[in-house]
Amino acid sequence: MKIGFWTWKSIKLSIAIPLMCSHVSSALRAELGLDEEAFGTAAAKKYETLLEKKWTSIVRLQKKIMDLESRNAALQTELANLTPTALSKRHQDPASWLPRSVRHSLESHRDTINSIAFHPIYSSLASCSDDCTIKIWDWELGELERTVKGHTRAVLDVDYGGPRSSILLASCSSDLSIKLWDPADEYKNIRTLLGHDHSVGAVRFIPSGASGTLSSGNLLVSASRDGTLRIWDVVTGYCVKTLRGHTAWVRDVCPSFDGRFLLSAGDDMTTRLWNISGSNSDHKLTMLGHEHVIECCALAPFASYQYLAALTGLKAPPASSAAEFMATGSRDKTIKLWDAHGRCLGTLIGHDNWVRALAFHPGGKYLLSVSDDKTLRCWDLSQGGKCVKTLKDAHERFITCLRWAPGIFKNVPGVSTRDANGESNGVLNTGLKGDTPDVQVRCVIATGGVDKKLQVFAD
C-alpha cells in the first residue's frame, strides 16, 4: 500500500514527539531524517493528537467491517436454509409484493415523525419530526447517518428531487419556511424560501417534461395552513405562482408524473385538481364527498388505470394521460377513489381511525394506507378495493406517514436521477409502450409514527 509523503511524515512525527524529551530524541531525529525544528512547540501542538485520531478512525472502520461481516454471515445462513417454497416467495413478482415483517425499526427522534422520503439513487431515507430535526438514515443497513438541524419549529414534510445534476432535499415547517439542503455537501442548507403566512404542511418537487421524459426539474410546490399552494423556482428561490381556492389548511399536495397537474386536499373537506401546464393555473376540478378533514391524497400511476377504469365500466385511458384517477384519505376513517370527472368510484371502509397517508403500489394492483388505528392496510383494486391484508400494530401508536421507494425508469433519454434508483428487488414492466419507459420496482416501503419509530419493510 502506498503512503503519501505528508501522511508518512505525520506518522513519523506522531511517534517521535512523545519521545522528544527523552535521551533517544537525537538518535531518533537522525534516524528519521528530521531537523531540529521538527520537535518545536508548534509541531508538537499540531501532531500531539494525530495518532489518537488515526486510531479512532481505524476503530470506526473496524466496527463497520464487523457489522458488514455479521450481516453477510446472516444472509449466508438465510440463503443456506431457504427451501424451494421460501425461495419462490422471496423471488415473487414485484407486482404482487406486499409488506410483511419489519426489516429495520429505527429510533433516534425525540418526538412524532411527520414525514419520510427516499433518496432517488442511494439507500438514504430522510425523516422529519416535531423535534425540529431531519434525520438521514441508511435503510439498507438500518443505521443513522446524520441529523440535520436548521428549522426552529416542527418539521412537517420532506421530499427529494431536483434536476439530474443536483438532487436536493426539501423540507417545510411550522416556522413558516421551506429549506433546501444539498446531500452532496453534507446536507448544507443552501436556500430558505419564505412567503407563506402560516405553517407549511407539505412540499413536493414537480416533475418536468412530457410523458416519457420523467425528469424532475427546478420547480417545487408547497401547501400551507394559510390556504394556498405556492410554486417555487429552487434555483432562484422565487415564488413563481400562488394557487388560491381552498378555504382552510391545505394538508397534502401531489404532482402528476408529467408535472402538468397538482392534486390537493385539506381541512375544507375538498379535493382539488389544478392544471398548471399553461400560463394560467386553472382550478380544473373540485371533489366533494368526505365528511371530515382530508388528510392525504394520491394520484394513481398508469399501471392502476386498468383496475380503476373497470369501476367506471370504461376503457382504460392511454398511458400519455395524467391525473385520470386519484385517492383521498380522511378523518372520517374512509378512503375514496375518484376519476378525472370528479365522480366517486368507491369508498373503502375498514380503518377505525383517521386515515393519514396513502401510496399506490407501483404494480398498479394495490393501494396501501396507514391510520391512527395503528394498522397498515392493503386494498386490492382488481377486486373493487377489497382489503386483502392488514398489518396490525405496525406501530405502537398512531401511524402518521407512508412512502414507497421510487422505482427505476428505463429507456428514457436524459432521464433525471430523481427517477433512477439503486438496486431493485425485481423487474416489472408496467405495460407502458413506445417511448414510455419500463419501470423497475423496489420492494421497499417505510412508515413513521407518534411512537417516534421509523419502520422499514423490505425484501
Swiss-Prot record:
Domain of life of the native organism: Eukaryota
Keyword annotations from UniProtKB, A to Z: Cell cycle, Cell division, Coiled coil, Cytoplasm, Cytoskeleton, Microtubule, Mitosis, Repeat, Transport, WD repeat
InterPro entries linked: Dynein_regulator_LIS1, G-protein_beta_WD-40_rep, LIS1_N, WD40/YVTN_repeat-like_dom_sf, WD40_repeat_CS, WD40_repeat_dom_sf, WD40_rpt
Localization terms from the record: Cytoplasm, Cytoskeleton; Cytoplasm, Cytoskeleton, Spindle pole
Xref: PROSITE patterns: WD_REPEATS_1 (PS00678), WD_REPEATS_2 (PS50082), WD_REPEATS_REGION (PS50294)
UniProt xrefs under SUPFAM superfamilies: Lissencephaly-1 protein (Lis-1, PAF-AH alpha) N-terminal domain (SSF109925), WD40 repeat-like (SSF50978)
Molecular function via GO: dynein complex binding
Pfam families: WD40
A single cellular component GO annotation: microtubule associated complex
Coiled-coil residues: 56-83
GO BP terms: cell division; establishment of mitotic spindle orientation; microtubule sliding
PANTHER family: WD REPEAT DOMAIN 5B, WD40 REPEAT PROTEIN
Subunit structure: Self-associates. Interacts with NDL1 and dynein.
Protein name in UniProt: Nuclear distribution protein PAC1-2
Source organism per UniProt: Uncinocarpus reesii (strain UAMH 1704)
Origin organism lineage: Eukaryota, Fungi, Dikarya, Ascomycota, Pezizomycotina
